[in-house]
């Protein structure tokens, strides 16, 4: 029990420390949440689900494992996804095609958002305005300004907003972060993050534009994004593969924001930082001849105070790095830690006489990260305490990935002010921090 309490205290302090730099007084804001949303630990919690594709259905099944959760409604603009979610949710749940109908349901206390990335900001902000707490998938936004508005909405309307970077709820991730912060592998000066895959030879292909399926509201799917003809890859929802909308700039940010956010989130947590000071990127669409817009090969270098972090992705060669197809390697003066969802390993550096400079450690994953992460959200919904991945943290982690994409797209060496969230001396890059919404949609807090 004492060890568990120490770990809990570490997590609380590290989360609050990450938020302290924002200047926000979080505890009072959450303590003043409206009485309607404050529920006792034994009360049922009515939850609505917006976006019921592959990730949305996974979240639905996970939340339903918690005894207090009652699924009040499921919502999707695509009929097959909606029908599948309705079957999982059961007869009591309403099946809706327009998320605004879901937000009008007074009985709903919390909303789980797993819509396409370009919808995350509006779904979250409008849910906060409707008095709902929110669990939103990563990346929180496509544009950095959207993420900042999401933070503002959570604070203004006194909402609990948890971001779905579920690795933060993994016990071995928590221990790994604690070991890094405690100096177990010494001074960390270099970090590598990566995820590799092989989409050879055709990638997502080149389907022509055409008419949307009859059971898809294409205009509502596009929402604030520019109006364009339907293309199967721009929509790209399929239960057996990654949704291909992720490879188009108007809706997402490629692997950089899909996988990179997970990896960079842990880096910033372990190193107790809120953002880099310099960013450079190299890469391109170097092999695949499909109609994706995002690169199939990318390397981004982030300069932080005291260390360098690299993110690497390739979609044309899946060879693993030291047995890891994805992960994080922290390189310290005393040893190296390899960390992924399966566990972590510490490999000591040695003296000239072969003596280990730190203890070798191997630890495997020991809990269900998704279940623990949703549990944390539900507990905070009741207690009004800050969740383990509050929207401020999720926004910061997402923004690092967005900066990598901006460096790649502008071919610039970017100088960044993390606290002010602005570039120094690069107007072109600065224009890529915000989006122009298609009418009638507006980004308004």
Language model regions located:
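N-terminal secretory signal peptides and thylakoid transit peptides that target proteins
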Residues: 1-18
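N-terminal Rossmann-like dinucleotide-binding module
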Residues: 17-89, 167-170, 267
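Residues forming the Rossmann-fold NAD(P)(H) cofactor-binding site
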Residues: 57, 121, 261
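Glycine-centered tight turns that cap/initiate beta-strands
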Residues: 68, 107, 184-187, 275
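Conserved SAM-binding strand-loop segment of SAM-dependent methyltransferases
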Residues: 93-98
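N-terminal Rossmann-like NAD(P) cofactor-binding module of classical short-chain dehydrogenase/reductase
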Residues: 111-112
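Beta-strand-loop-alpha-helix segment that lines the small-molecule cofactor/substrate pocket
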Residues: 116, 121-169, 183
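Contiguous beta-strand/loop segments that form the cofactor/metal-binding neighborhood of enzyme cores
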Residues: 174-175, 187-445
């Amino acid at each position: 029990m004492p060890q568990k309490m120490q770990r809990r205290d570490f997590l609380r302090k590290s989360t609050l420390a990450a938020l302290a730099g924002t200047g926000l007084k979080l505890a009072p804001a959450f303590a003043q949440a409206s009485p309607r949303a404050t529920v006792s630990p034994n009360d049922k919690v009515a939850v609505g689900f917006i976006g019921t594709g592959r990730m949305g259905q996974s979240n639905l099944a996970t939340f339903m494992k918690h005894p207090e959760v009652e699924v009040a409604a499921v919502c999707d603009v695509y009929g097959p996804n909606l029908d599948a979610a309705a079957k999982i949710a059961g007869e009591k749940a309403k099946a809706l095609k327009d998320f605004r109908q879901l937000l009008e349901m007074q009985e709903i206390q919390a909303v789980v958002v797993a819509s396409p990335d370009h919808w995350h900001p509006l779904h979250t902000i409008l849910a906060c305005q409707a008095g709902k707490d929110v669990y939103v998938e990563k990346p929180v936004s496509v544009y950095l300004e959207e993420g900042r508005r999401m933070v503002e909405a959570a604070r203004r309307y006194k909402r609990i907003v948890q971001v779905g970077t579920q690795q933060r709820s993994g016990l071995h991730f928590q221990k790994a972060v604690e070991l890094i912060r405690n100096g177990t592998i010494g001074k960390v000066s270099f970090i590598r993050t990566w995820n590799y895959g092989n989409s050879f030879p055709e990638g997502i292909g080149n389907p022509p534009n055409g008419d949307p399926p009859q059971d898809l509201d294409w205009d509502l799917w596009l929402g604030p994004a520019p109006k364009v003809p339907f293309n199967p890859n721009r929509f790209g929802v399929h239960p057996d593969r990654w949704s291909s909308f992720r490879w188009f700039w108007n809706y997402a940010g490629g692997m950089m924001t899909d996988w990179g956010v997970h990896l960079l989130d842990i880096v910033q947590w372990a190193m107790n930082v809120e953002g880099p000071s310099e960013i450079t990127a190299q890469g391109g669409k170097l092999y695949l001849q499909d109609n994706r817009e995002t690169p199939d090969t990318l390397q981004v270098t982030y300069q932080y105070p005291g260390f360098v972090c690299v993110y690497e992705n390739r979609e044309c060669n899946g060879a693993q790095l030291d047995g890891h197809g994805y992960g994080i390697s922290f390189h310290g003066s005393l040893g190296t830690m390899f960390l992924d969802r399966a566990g972590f390993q510490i490999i000591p550096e040695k003296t000239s006489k072969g003596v280990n400079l730190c203890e070798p450690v191997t630890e495997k994953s020991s809990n269900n990260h998704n279940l623990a992460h949703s549990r944390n959200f539900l507990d905070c919904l009741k207690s009004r305490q800050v969740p383990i991945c509050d929207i401020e943290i999720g926004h910061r982690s997402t923004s690092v990935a967005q900066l990598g994409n901006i460096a790649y797209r502008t071919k610039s060496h970017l100088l960044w002010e993390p606290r002010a969230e602005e570039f120094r001396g690069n107007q072109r890059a600065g224009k890529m921090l915000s989006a122009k919404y298609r009418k009638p949609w507006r980004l308004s807090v």
